């Protein structure tokens, strides 16, 4: 993996040329080491030397979650002795998939989060309170710790849950930044209010949020984001988008206008149901090609997540592609009386009802031919 943190500030044309050079290296690596992609290239008569531009990726079939589940071990590109870490996906849309990482992959993971924290305006002068698990085969928790260490931040590894312990840590260590699932911030606020803690004057000034959307496609705060911001206006909220499969993340800058691509680490496409690129302004399925991964690199992997892309330059100075919060997962699309919607739209409504603390959404298919 090549570290080039300045590439995100280059022109879109320079970024594209840089990524195409890394793509050539990735294809050669897959041809040499991946049993799954060796078979794919053979079956589809793909000459990787002819794949020179990002647009040429359309000549290659996509990789799906089903491929990963059915052929998990065939994606591994390294000897077992070179594997340092084992993790699994969340299994949101099916059986969890095992991913393996080498020592260099862990370095890449650390660099990813270094870039992510940097994008969110963190520095070595910050102290991070890690409010996510670092165990249970969860890649991200370890990534956050490694990235904070690379940036030079101090870290308090509190883990998830236990509001009392979280507030005790805030009072003892005075962290300036939190890494957290945003809905847990509601629980921290409720605990503070019940225990006469003035959360608006505490040391915590920003949170990098994972796992749940905070914004609408127009960049305004959604219901969850509004609830947090109204109760804790002094806290800045930064959204991220990531997955185990991509081993990297998209993170908002201080403009809060979408998560920035990290060009050294992945190539992203936005595809329709026919695996063709959608136009800017149309929602598409996030499809990624990893760059610089040794253990289990992926080529044109369809994440199942539907997002918008933004290509205009950002006021922060970065010229990378940005993406919106997740509109929904392709496998969870609902058609109701001719209208298409995704579960997050329901979540946003339920999050706006104060008396609703927890909920489960159940979907049933009507026995009649029409949807209901």
Name every feature range the model reports, one short phrase each.
Residues 1-88, 94-111, 115-119, 230, ...:
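Nucleotide 5′-phosphate-binding alpha/beta core
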Residues 30, 178, 268, 305, ...:
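Residue-level signal for inorganic ion chemistry
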Residues 103-118, 127-187:
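AMP-binding/adenylate-forming
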Residues 127-129, 195-218:
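Conserved helix-loop-beta element of the AMP-binding
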Residues 301, 320-350:
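Adenylate-forming
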Residues 364-372:
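Single conserved hydrophobic/aromatic residue that forms the stacking wall/gate
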């Amino acid at each position: 993996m090549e570290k080039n943190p300045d590439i995100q500030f280059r022109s879109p044309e320079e970024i594209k040329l840089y990524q195409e050079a890394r793509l050539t290296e990735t294809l050669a690596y897959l041809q040499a080491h991946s049993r799954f992609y060796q078979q794919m290239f053979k079956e589809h008569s793909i000459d990787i030397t002819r794949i020179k531009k990002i647009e040429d990726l359309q000549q290659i079939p996509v990789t799906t979650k089903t491929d990963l589940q059915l052929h998990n071990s065939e994606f591994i590109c390294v000897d077992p002795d070179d594997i340092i870490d084992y993790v699994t996906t969340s299994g949101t849309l099916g059986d969890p998939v095992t991913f393996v990482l080498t020592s260099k992959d862990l370095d890449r993971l650390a660099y990813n989060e270094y870039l992510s924290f940097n994008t969110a305006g963190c520095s070595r002068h910050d102290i991070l309170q890690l409010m996510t698990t670092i165990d249970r085969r969860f890649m991200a928790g370890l990534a956050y710790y490694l990235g904070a260490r690379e940036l030079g931040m101090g870290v308090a590894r509190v883990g998830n849950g236990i509001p009392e312990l979280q507030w005790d840590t805030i009072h003892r260590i005075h962290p300036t930044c939190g890494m957290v699932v945003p809905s847990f911030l509601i629980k921290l606020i409720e605990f503070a209010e019940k225990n006469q803690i003035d959360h608006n004057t505490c040391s915590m000034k920003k949170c990098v949020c994972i796992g749940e959307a905070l914004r609408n496609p127009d960049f305004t705060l959604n219901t969850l984001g509004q609830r947090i911001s109204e109760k804790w206006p002094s806290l800045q909220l930064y959204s991220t988008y990531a997955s185990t499969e991509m081993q990297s993340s998209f993170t908002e800058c201080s403009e809060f206008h979408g998560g920035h691509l990290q060009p050294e680490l992945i190539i992203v496409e936005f595809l329709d149901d026919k695996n063709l690129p959608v136009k800017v302004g149309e929602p598409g399925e996030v499809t990624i090609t990893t760059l610089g991964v040794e253990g289990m690199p992926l080529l044109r992997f369809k994440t199942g997540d539907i997002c918008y892309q933004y290509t205009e330059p950002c006021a922060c100075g970065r010229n990378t592609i940005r993406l919106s919060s997740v509109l929904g997962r392709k496998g969870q699309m609902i058609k109701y009386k001719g209208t298409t919607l995704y579960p997050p739209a329901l979540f946003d409504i339920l999050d706006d009802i104060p008396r609703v603390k927890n909920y489960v959404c159940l979907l049933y298919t009507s026995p009649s031919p029409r949807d209901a």
